[in-house]
Each structure stands twice: as C-alpha cells, then as structure tokens.
Design a protein with these regions (language model features):
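Short, charged/polar, low-complexity loop and linker segments
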Residues: 10-22, 40-42
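Long amphipathic alpha-helical coiled-coil segments
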Residues: 23, 55-61, 111-119
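Short, small-residue-biased leader/transition segments that mark boundaries at the very start
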Residues: 1-6
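Heptad-repeat coiled-coil alpha-helices
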Residues: 9, 46, 50, 72, ...
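Charged/polar, solvent-exposed surface patches and flexible loops
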Residues: 46, 58, 65, 72, ...
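Surface-exposed interaction/gating patches
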Residues: 25-59, 63-66, 70
Length: 133
C-alpha cells in the first residue's frame, strides 16, 4: 500500500515525495505517512542499537519531515480518515524516539574514547535537546 510506496521511494530518493506523485486518495497518503513514521522509528532504533548514530539521526529527521507533511495537509477530517489522530500518534512516536536517541547520546558522551566522543558531539550540537556535554 501507500506505506510501502512512501518508504521505498524515500529509501531510493532520500526524501518524501509529495502527495501529487502518488495516485492515491488523500486519506491513503496520510495513512501511509503515519504508518511509515512507525517503520522509520524501527529503523532508527535498530541503528541506535548498533550505535549507528548518523543513520539513526537520519531516520529521526525523516520522521520529523513526515510529521511536518501531516501538519501541512489541510483537508476536511471526513476526507482524511483522522488526520489529527495520525499526526498526534506520529508526534508521540517521534518524541519517544528522540528521547531514546538522547539517552544513547548521553551514554556515548560518558565514554572515555575520544574518537567516539568527538563523533557524538558533532551530532549533539545539532539538537536543542537536553544532552549532557
């Protein structure tokens, strides 16, 4: 469905294509974005487990971009099949992912390995979040 198309196109092109590029009803696109955010969370967490912080960050960023798209869409709720619910759910998923990302960054910052600390600091500086430096 839409989730697979959105995800696959992102994986091949590196960005979320606009609604007009898909031959689907607006509610299918919205549902696809919402569902794909959950899939990107899984990928972000998989990369976190492997300490692939840059890859994990890229999935967090695309999740936020997906939420931005959901927030920009302005269709009546009857057409969208519950846009607000999808946006609220996506927001919660992103906040949990960001929290887990910050937890790992904090753990990495506590390491004595200078190379790891420098790499982690470069990521930390991008986020206006509560990460101990």
């Amino acid at each position: 469905g839409s989730e697979m198309c959105i995800r696959d196109r992102y994986e091949s092109k590196g960005y979320i294509e606009p609604f007009e590029k898909f031959n689907v009803h607006p509610s299918s696109y919205i549902q696809g974005i919402g569902d794909t955010i959950g899939e990107w969370r899984r990928k972000a967490l998989d990369n976190l487990r492997n300490l692939e912080l840059v890859k994990s960050e890229s999935y967090l960023n695309i999740m936020e971009e997906g939420l931005g798209i959901l927030n920009e869409l302005d269709y009546p709720d009857a057409l969208t099949g519950g846009l607000r619910r999808y946006a609220d759910n996506a927001r919660g998923i992103i906040e949990r992912t960001r929290s887990e990302f910050c937890t790992i960054l904090n753990k990495q910052m506590s390491l004595t390995n200078t190379a790891v600390k420098e790499k982690t600091l470069a990521i930390v500086k991008k986020y206006p979040i509560n990460v101990k430096q």
